[in-house]
Each structure stands twice: as structure tokens, then as C-alpha cells.
Amino acid sequence: MSDQLADQLKATSLSSGPEDWKKGLNLPARDTRQQTEDVTNTRGLDWEDFIHDRDLLMGIFEAGFEKPSPIQEEAIPVALTGRDILARAKNGTGKTAAFVIPALNKINPKVSKIQCLILVPTRELAMQTSQVCKTLGKHLGINVMVTTGGTGLRDDIVRLQDPVHIVVGTPGRILDLAGKQVADLSECPMFIMDEADKLLSQEFTPVIEQLLQFHPKDRQVMLFSATFPLSVKDFSDKNMTSPYEINLMDELTLRGITQYYAFVEEKQKVHCLNTLFSKLQINQSIIFCNSTNRVELLAKKITELGYSCFYSHAKMAQQARNRVFHDFRNGVCRNLVCSDLLTRGIDIQAVNVVINFDFPKNAETYLHRIGRSGRYGHLGLAINLINWDDRFNLYNIERDLGTEIQPIPQTIDKSLYVYENPESIPRPISTFKPIAQQPQQQLQQSQRPQQSQQQQHFSTQTQPSNQLPPQQGNQQLGFNPQAQQPHRPIPQAQGDWQGQNGRQNGTGASNNQPRPTNYQNNRGQPGSSRGGRGRGFQGQGGRQNQNYGGQRGPRTQGQGQPQGPLSAQ
């Protein structure tokens, strides 16, 4: 017995340094992609400089967070002191972790009370934020609950019977639970608002002020956003105590995002989008429209062209929205068409291209849209399809943001948005398990039960797009007359998106992207061409450049107004 004890003592060694505990961590593969100064311009601090809880540090490192970003360096030490914070930083620079980490550090797991309330404007952002809380705090024994509208109250009421330390949700649902005295916020010391500018708009402000009445008077209030209108200052003066202001917006747009515009007639936009798909090397893309009807119509057209596509908007059933959000995050589909529902805070690092099929009306919406690419200092591409009515909005947005959106060139350098090893791009923090693949008809019925089958076109592609090579293209974005295929018209849509005066000259849809398994009326079979010759954009001065239906010169004046009526917005 004594010999065995002696052998064990010989085999036992004391810790040789403070870093030994890191050797047993389950660290993800390191992201070796290039990063811009948006996240690298730091003071050189480490997580250990302001976080001393080893269990929290384990969650931080296992989530792949190697060094704090500038907003995290500025906000976390102040938040730990309990002071109110007004923090403004660019999209995709780590604002979520900047308030989640200090909140986790200050929570006492032994106290069975709600100790932190995090408000977000959308349901998708609520789910994403709750997953960040769960992942970073997985070693702390902290319970996180997410609650949003669109679902029944029963599950939330049952869940709140058990200890909950952090509640993440949308304002209306939280107010409903607090008003019914189901959620006890009387001892909740932390009140956090992400995307605070949206939450303090006229739509949400009355709800926010009512929610504050359920909190103790000595609460800590923290506001985070990329844009702060005057409504934020009014709220701060009324409800915050000497807030510490952080402003890291030396410029408004992310440095890693390259912005272009293509001037194109409304009825030629689908042709232009088809060309972009076939020429650009897209890992994942988000395509924005200005209305829910146009979202569904465009998703239908994209699927008919032979590309995998999901769509999402606010009028969909919550279950369908959840499935689309999770599947797209996990790489099930390459392209997502959506309204402004997903412009706020959604973090999908595999997205390298954002396309504004409908140009936004204001600079704030534009800034949040293009911020879906180029996440956390990485590279991205934003392409805007501009018609004649958008020319003044383009000028105003350039002026308000202090940036210049260049005309799209014949050739786009791959180094601006393409990574050599897309399979190494990390997926967002998520514990979601992909839903088993269902037949096409079931998927259509789960998304829009009230629609007919012919109006539903969801792809059943299940292979993650970040493990597929980016769509290959020769980067020559103009139409190539020598590469024409036999002419075949694009299927007619429910709108004036098909040109009445001829079609552009192109090679049609590329076969490099995964194609859906079902096609309406036998359209879109592999190998078919969707090219055609046409005059594109024509002005008074004669025929213009046919790339993208004609690329216009100066944006504020010119003689090339499109002929004929544009389609209805």
C-alpha cells in the first residue's frame, strides 16, 4: 500500500504555471482569416486583465474568443463597476460579448432570481443572443431563458417556475410576463438593450419605459448600438445616471466591406442577379427586399433559375422563421432572401456577399444591411441594384455615411471578399441540432400553409455551404456575347420583372451551385440556358453599356432616363 502511494506521489506534479489550465480546454480551430483595424486596433489587453473567474474564462476561450476587441476592452471594465453605459460601435465588432461577459461575471448562480434582462428588437436576434449567453456561461451553472412573441405564454410561465438568471427577449413579451407578475424583475440589477436605437424608436419606447418601472431604482442600464439618434439621448437623460459614453465610430462603415452599385432597370434586376450568382464566388449571401411580397416573389424566381434559396420575413409563422434562421446559420442553404427583419445584429460569418435587390430609403437601414457581411473585421462585398428612382437615395446615403459607393467594375478582385479556405470559416455560436430533412411539400406547408404549392420554392439542399467551394466564376461581370447558349426565356413572374423589350446577353444560370430537387413546370433543368440578347438600359443618347442592363454615369444628373414604366414597388 505504501509503495502504491509513493508511486502516485512521484507521478503527481504541481502546476508549473498559471496557463496550465488552458491545456485541457476544448478549443475550436483558429480562424486564420485576415482582419481589419475595426477589431485589431486594441490596447493589447488579454481577457485575464479584467475577468478573473476561471469558469467564465473557459467559456470565452472555448468559444474561440482569443483577444478582446476594442469595444470589449472599453465596455467590459466599466460594466463590471456597475456604471451605466452608452456604447456605440460598428456592426460586427463584438458588441454582444461586450455586455454578455460582464453580465455573466456579475451573476450569482446561487440566487434563484432574474438578475439580468437583455432586450433585443427581433426574435431571431433574441435566439442568437441567448445562445451566446449559454455558450460563454456553460461552466457557470447559469440558467438562460429566451422569450419572444409569436409563441404561447404557457411554456414561458412553466419555465419561470424554475430558477432563471438571465432573460433574453423582445419588449412586448417581457412586459406581458412582468405585467402578469410571472417574471419578477424587482431584484433584477441589470437592464441591457442591444440595438438600442431601434428599441427606443416610437414603436418600442412606451414599452421600454413601462419595463423600467418593474426594476429597482439602483439598476444598471447599458445601451449598445451602431447608431444613436436623438431619442437615445432623451432616454439617457431621463433614465440613466451619469452614463459612461463610448464612441468607437471614427467612421460609420466597416473597412472590410467593398461597396458597389449597378444601375439597372427594374425589369432587368433578375437578369442582373442571375449574372452576379453565376460570376461571383459566393459562400453565402443575403439578398434584401423592401417588402414581404417582393421577398417571396424574388425567392420564387431565384429557385426557378436553379439556385438554392430560403426566404424569411415578418409575416411568416414563427416556427418557419426559426427553422429558416437556424438552417441558414448552419449552412444548409447558400442564399437567403429577406426583408429588414434580419438587418439587426444577425451574425453569420460565412456570409461574404450582401445584395440590396431593393435599395433602402435611409442611411441607417443601409448601414445595418451591409453589416451582415464583413463580420468581426473580415472581408465582405455589398452590391446595390439601383434604378432611376433610387438615384437621390444613393446620393443621400453616401453623404450621410461619409462614404462613396463605386460603380461596379467589369472585374471584381477576389481578394476583396473571397477566402482561399472557406471550410475554415467558423459557424456562429449555436447549440442547435439541424432538423431532419423533410419532403419538399412538408417544408412548403410548414413555412406558408395558406399559400398554394406553386408559390412555394424552398430548396432541400442539406450540405453545409461552408464546406462547399465558393461558386466559381471568371470574375468578368459583363455579359459575354461569344458565350451565348440557345435562347430560353426566364419564367414569367407575378410582376414586371421580365423585360418587355428583349433580354440581356448572358450565359444564364451557373451549374456550380447546388440545384433544388423540384422544378415548376419542368423549368430549370440542369444544363439549360437562360440567356438572351437585348438592349438593356437605353437613354436619349442612344444605346448604353449593356452590363447589368446599362451602367449609368453621374448619379445626380444625366439624359439616360429609362423608357417605359417601372414595375410597382
Swiss-Prot record:
One Pfam family here: DEAD
Signal sequence bounds: none
Ranges of compositional bias, category Low complexity: 437-482, 543-569
GO CC field: cytoplasmic stress granule; P-body
Main location as per UniProt: cytoplasm
Region feature (Disordered): 1-39, 436-569
One example of a Gene Ontology biological process annotation: mRNA transport
Location in or out of the cell: Cytoplasm, P-body
Domain Helicase C-terminal: 256-416
GO MF annotations in UniProt: ATP binding; ATP hydrolysis activity; mRNA binding; RNA helicase activity
Origin: domain of life: Eukaryota
PROSITE patterns assigned to the protein according to its UniProt record, in alphabetical order: DEAD_ATP_HELICASE, HELICASE_ATP_BIND_1, HELICASE_CTER, Q_MOTIF
Family: Belongs to the DEAD box helicase family. DDX6/DHH1 subfamily.
PANTHER family (UniProt xref): DEAD-BOX ATP-DEPENDENT RNA HELICASE 50
Function according to Swiss-Prot or TrEMBL: ATP-dependent RNA helicase involved in mRNA turnover, and more specifically in mRNA decapping. Is involved in G1/S DNA-damage checkpoint recovery, probably through the regulation of the translational status of a subset of mRNAs. May also have a role in translation and mRNA nuclear export.
Protein name listed in UniProt: ATP-dependent RNA helicase dhh1
Biological source species: Neurospora crassa (strain ATCC 24698 / 74-OR23-1A / CBS 708.71 / DSM 1257 / FGSC 987)
Phylogenetic lineage: Eukaryota, Fungi, Dikarya, Ascomycota, Pezizomycotina
Gene name in the database record: drh-10
